[in-house]
């Protein structure tokens, strides 16, 4: 997943070849200090290649697999409003453990949706990964700023 080339722009510093975790963390620090735009190709490349993790290909490891909708009703409401759509894409911000009160697990399991689970807390993120969700995951937070912050 190492980019084969760097992204160059006359007004921007290019990303150096990323070889390991320290390299991409260093590159992220550089982009953070520059307060690059959220759609900067260098930032997008680092996030895609080094932060977002692929969906699990292992069986689910849920605490309560018999509970189809752990969202306490929100997902059922959305499912109805979306006319029980199959094959959609979701973004869940604040995935917690990937199961408890999840608004997206029902879409993933019953409607064949894919998506992105975002969880900022490293401890909870480890729990998300243990659930073997069939969605992309990222251990990151959202920001009110239009540039990356640490």
Q: Where is each model-derived feature located?
A:
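Phosphate/nucleotide-binding beta-alpha loop and adjacent structural elements of enzyme active sites
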Residues: 1-150
């Amino acid at each position: 997943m190492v980019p084969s080339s760097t992204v160059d722009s006359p007004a921007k510093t290019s990303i150096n070849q990323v070889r390991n975790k320290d390299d991409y963390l260093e590159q992220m620090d550089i982009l953070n200090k520059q307060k690059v735009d959220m759609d900067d190709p260098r930032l997008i490349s680092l996030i895609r290649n080094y932060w977002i993790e692929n969906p699990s290909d292992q069986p689910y490891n849920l605490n309560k697999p018999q509970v189809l909708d752990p969202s306490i009703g929100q997902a059922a409401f959305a499912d109805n409003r979306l006319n029980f759509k199959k094959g959609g894409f979701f973004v869940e911000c604040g995935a917690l453990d990937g199961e408890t009160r999840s608004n997206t697990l029902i879409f993933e399991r019953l409607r064949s949706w894919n998506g992105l689970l975002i969880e900022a807390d490293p401890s909870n993120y480890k729990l998300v990964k243990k659930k073997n969700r069939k969605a992309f995951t990222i251990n990151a937070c959202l920001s009110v700023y239009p540039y990356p912050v640490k």
